[in-house]
Curated annotation (Swiss-Prot):
Residues 1-21 form the signal peptide. Highest levels in placenta, lung and liver. Also present in heart, brain, pancreas and kidney. Cleaves C-terminal amino acids linked to proline in peptides such as angiotensin II, III and des-Arg9-bradykinin. This cleavage occurs at acidic pH, but enzymatic activity is retained with some substrates at neutral pH. Residues 194-334 are annotated as: SKS domain. InterPro entries: AB_hydrolase_fold, Peptidase_S28, Ser_carbopepase_S28_SKS. PANTHER family: LYSOSOMAL PRO-X CARBOXYPEPTIDASE (PTHR11010:SF38), PROTEASE S28 PRO-X CARBOXYPEPTIDASE-RELATED (PTHR11010). GO terms for biological process: angiogenesis involved in wound healing; angiotensin maturation; energy homeostasis; glucose homeostasis; negative regulation of systemic arterial blood pressure; plasma kallikrein-kinin cascade; regulation of blood vessel endothelial cell migration; regulation of reactive oxygen species metabolic process. Its EC number is 3.4.16.2. This is Lysosomal Pro-X carboxypeptidase.
Length: 496
């Protein structure tokens, strides 16, 4: 991984302050939902209304009256005023329309649960910008970008919906989210249990903080995915780093690397660490989107893309040049499966979305997730977790320093057994599962494991190629939601 422990993402078209420092594995959580065109529609467009609600910029202070418009989407085709429910998507780090169109599970179960679907956009993402074009100007404007403020937005929006939509006032609400949104769904149930009767937190790494889990668990799972997908695959990747180091020692070697990897720009010796970070991030992204069918989540990819990649990485005991030619073929599966890309751009994974800006600030304040590699239990170069280095980079970038223990102080870390009605789902292929809840905590804090699942596969729309493990997971999730809805109405009936 990176020599300075951080991957520099340059968004020079925005402004000088837009240079972002973010570790590849951590940025993957944010960039996972930020395609080049985040409002692109799926093959079958969803029918929803686009609405706006006036939110306070600061819910927890009393000397500011500034407000902004939070965007949210509503779909009520299958909603029933009698015995119905509200499924509330806790928006995360990106454009809410993209989330709406890519969370097919909610659309698939809406009729069965007689549900209204609500997708709430997270402040500072998409169109929900508290200070408009100045929202990312400096840390003073970004000061209100916190999970706590976002949860308060969700609470106020639910109150507004129940107050203004006839028939919604006395209906149960269930929070649903994936990845960071899954963390928010769980935290929302913890902090506002009177607002939602339960939460589905898919691929939510709520324990990827401080020392709650080993810092190397994420990259270890990435490595396991590659090791299981083809003979000698992870070993080939492990050996590629030294091959790159040796070949980049000379000008002719750099020139050869540029050609062999079909890069868009000539490599210099200063580019080598960035090149290795870019390659590392590619393997991370593949682990997260290792779906059982062809998909277009981050890039157009075949079914089980890691198996396809590993077909080119069967023999680690070859010359440096042949090994790296094989690495190119593997990279080409991710970046050029469509066959339309003429060269590979090692800055390509830095998307041009404001979502990346917001996430980099959150990673420098609250969402401080330790990652490390040792080159023994994983296929990456050794790299230790260095909080001071992160803190210094964050201060240089944003003028703020991280609070690594704040999330566990706010939400309890592993001491959450007093809460109820949260389903934590994780795919065993997903590297974020290492920071997730993978075992039942109580009868009502339940873990659902998807043996053939990558990153929140259960929230994707149903597919004929879905493995049995995800079909069972969705069935369990719906059963829990039905129980929460039934208990809500049973309790309401007893009170009258």
């Amino acid at each position: 991984m990176g020599r300075r422990a951080l991957l520099l993402l340059l968004l020079s078209f925005l402004a000088p302050w837009a240079t972002i420092a973010l570790r590849p594995a951590l940025r993957a959580l944010g960039s996972l939902h930020l395609p080049t065109n985040p409002t692109s529609l799926p093959a079958v467009a969803k029918n929803y209304s686009v609405l706006y609600f006036q939110q306070k910029v600061d819910h927890f202070g009393f000397n500011t009256v500034k407000t902004f418009n939070q965007r949210y989407l509503v779909a009520d085709k299958y909603w029933k005023k009698n015995g119905g429910s509200i499924l509330f998507y806790t928006g995360n780090e990106g454009d809410i329309i993209w989330f709406c169109n890519n969370t097919g599970f909610m659309w698939d179960v809406a009729e069965e649960l007689k549900a209204m679907l609500v997708f709430a956009e997270h402040r500072y993402y998409g169109e929900s910008l508290p200070f408009g074009d100045n929202s990312f100007k400096d840390s003073r404007h970004l000061n209100f970008l916190t999970s706590e403020q976002a949860l308060a937005d969700f609470a106020e929006l639910i109150k507004h919906l129940k107050r203004t939509i006839p028939g919604a006032e006395n209906q149960p609400v269930i929070a649903i989210g994936g990845s960071y949104g899954g963390m928010l769904a769980a935290w929302f149930r913890m902090k506002y249990p009177h607002m939602v009767v339960g939460a589905l937190a898919a691929s939510a790494p709520i324990w990827q903080f401080e020392d709650l889990v080993p810092c190397g668990v994420f990259m270890k799972i990435v490595t396991t995915d590659f090791r299981k997908s083809g003979p000698h695959c992870s070993e080939s990747i492990h050996r590629s780093w030294d091959a790159i180091n040796r070949l980049s020692n000379t000008g002719s070697g750099l020139q050869w690397l540029t050609g062999a990897l079909h890069l868009c720009s000539p490599l210099t010796s200063q580019d080598i660490q960035h090149l290795k970070d870019w390659i590392s991030e590619t393997w991370v992204n593949l682990a997260m989107v290792d779906y059982p069918y062809a998909s277009n989540f981050l890039q157009p990819l075949p079914a089980w893309p890691i198996k396809v990649v590993c077909q080119y990485l069967k023999n680690p005991n070859v010359s440096d040049s042949l090994l790296l030619q094989n690495i190119f073929q593997a990279l080409n599966v991710y970046y050029n499966y469509s066959g339309q890309v003429k060269c590979l751009n090692i800055s390509e994974t830095a998307t041009s979305s404001l979502g990346t800006l917001g996430w980099s600030y959150q990673a420098c304040t609250e969402v401080v997730m330790p990652f490390c590699t040792n080159g023994v239990d994983d296929m990456f170069e050794p790299h230790s977790w260095n909080l001071k280095e992160l803190s210094d980079d964050c201060f240089q970038q944003w003028g703020v320093r991280p609070r690594p223990s704040w999330i566990t102080t706010m939400y309890g870390g592993k001491n959450i057994s007093s809460h109820t009605n949260i389903v934590f789902s994780n795919g065993e292929l997903d590297p974020w599962s290492g920071g997730g809840v993978t075992k039942d905590i109580t009868d009502t804090l339940v873990a659902v494991t998807i043996s053939e699942g990558a990153h929140h596969l259960d929230l994707r729309t149903k597919n004929a190629l879905d493995p049995m493990s995800v079909l069972l997971a969705r069935s369990l999730e719906v059963r829990h939601m039905k129980n929460w809805i039934r208990d809500f109405y049973d309790s309401a009936g007893k009170q009258h």
